[in-house]
Every structure is written in C-alpha cells, then in structure tokens.
A protein has these predicted regions:
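Short active-site oxyanion
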Residues: 95-100
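Nucleic-acid-processing active sites and adjacent nucleic-acid-binding tracks
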Residues: 74-94
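A short alpha/beta connector and helix-capping loop motif
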Residues: 56-73
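N-terminal accessory regions of nucleic-acid-interacting proteins
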Residues: 1-46, 115, 126, 179
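Acidic, Mg2+-coordinating catalytic module of metal-dependent nucleases/exonucleases
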Residues: 145-188
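Short acidic, Gly/Ser-rich segments with clustered Asp/Glu that frequently serve as metal-coordination loops
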Residues: 45-58
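Short hydrophobic/aromatic-enriched beta-strand-loop microsegments
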Residues: 119-127
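Short alpha-helix plus adjacent loop in nuclease-associated cores
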Residues: 126-146
Length: 188
C-alpha cells in the first residue's frame, strides 16, 4: 500500500466528514460502567480517547471528564466527572489481553492517572504505529485523512465535557475520535 507521507489542512478541509456508524452509549453510573466494561473485556481490540473540559485560565486544568472506548459496533462514553475512574474501568485499562489503540495516549494516561493510579497494559500509540508506513503527520485528523480520505471534525473539541447533558454533536464527536483510532489500526 503506497501512502501519502503528509497532507495539508486545506486537503483535509475539502474531504467528507467521517462519523462513527455504530451505537453510542453514555455511561453515567457505576452499574452502567460495570455492564459496559463486561462487554468491552470480551473484545480483542478497542479504540480509546479522552476529553477534558477546556480551561481558559493559564496554569489551571481540569480532570478528564470523558473516556471514550470503542469497538467496531459500540462506543461507550464514560462520564468520569460523574462516576470517577471505577475499578472495572481500571481493570480494563490494565488487561493485557485487550489491545487499546489511541493517539497521544501518553497525554491521556497522564491525565487519567490524576483520577486514580493504574498500570495500563497492551496499548498501541498510533503516532508511532503509523511511522513504518511512511506517514509523517501526527494528528488524528491528518492520519485519518491520508488513509480514508475523510475528515474528523474537531468542532466540539473545546466544548464543555462536564455539562449535565452531552449534546448529540458532542457524543458523535467523542465516539468518532475513539472509533477512528480503531479504524486506522484495522486498516494498517
């Protein structure tokens, strides 16, 4: 497979928008988290991402509000601002039998460790994973554009991830980000 090494913002802008095609489940209680993790533990490979409420004050940051974990069919949006990082989620992150694929995982895990200690296992960093394929770009939007000729919308990135109710646009954005990581891994 011959791939482009890089892609311009202008090229990405002209592409059709990618959207997660599966079911999205918002997880707001510990019992919901337990059921969701039971399903996720049965999967071989998962896409993972997180969202944090943006801070517009220098030196101030918020804890991770949302952890997105996606299979090919379902994406679970764990509202960590409501449930915290529950033991079942920690057990999934530590499970060496379930591969977790994401982009900038070091940053995600650094922020998640502020919620609870854990030792993540079986994680694949896409920025490193795509390098042997000749891809030089490091952003999810550009890597996805190179491989699928579709763009990942970033319009919700700076929205309030701690809102009482997530909008449909937020849910779709969050699910697409986690699923896109999985999609990239499957293709390569």
């Amino acid at each position: 497979m011959i791939l482009k090494r890089t892609i311009s913002k202008e090229e990405v802008k002209e592409m059709p928008k990618a959207a997660f095609p599966g079911r999205i489940h918002v997880i707001q209680t510990e019992s919901e988290a337990e059921k969701a993790v039971a399903y996720l533990q049965s999967q071989a490979i998962l896409g993972i991402d997180s969202e944090t409420r943006p801070s517009f004050t220098k030196g101030h940051s918020h804890k991770v509000a949302l952890l997105q974990i996606s299979s090919d069919e379902c994406c679970f949006l764990f509202r960590l601002n409501m449930t915290g990082l529950t033991q079942p989620i920690i057990e999934l992150l530590e499970n060496p039998e379930v591969i977790k694929v994401g982009l900038s995982l070091k940053d995600d895990f650094m922020m998640l460790h502020k919620r609870a200690p854990f030792n993540q296992q079986a994680c694949i960093e896409l920025q490193e994973y795509v390098r042997p394929f000749g891809i030089q770009d490091k952003s999810l939007q550009k890597i996805y554009g190179i491989l699928f000729r579709e763009k990942i919308s970033k319009s919700q990135r700076l929205s309030n991830w701690e809102a009482d109710v997530l909008t449909d646009a937020q849910k779709q954005y969050a699910a697409t980000d986690a699923w896109a990581c999985l999609n990239i891994y499957h293709l390569l």
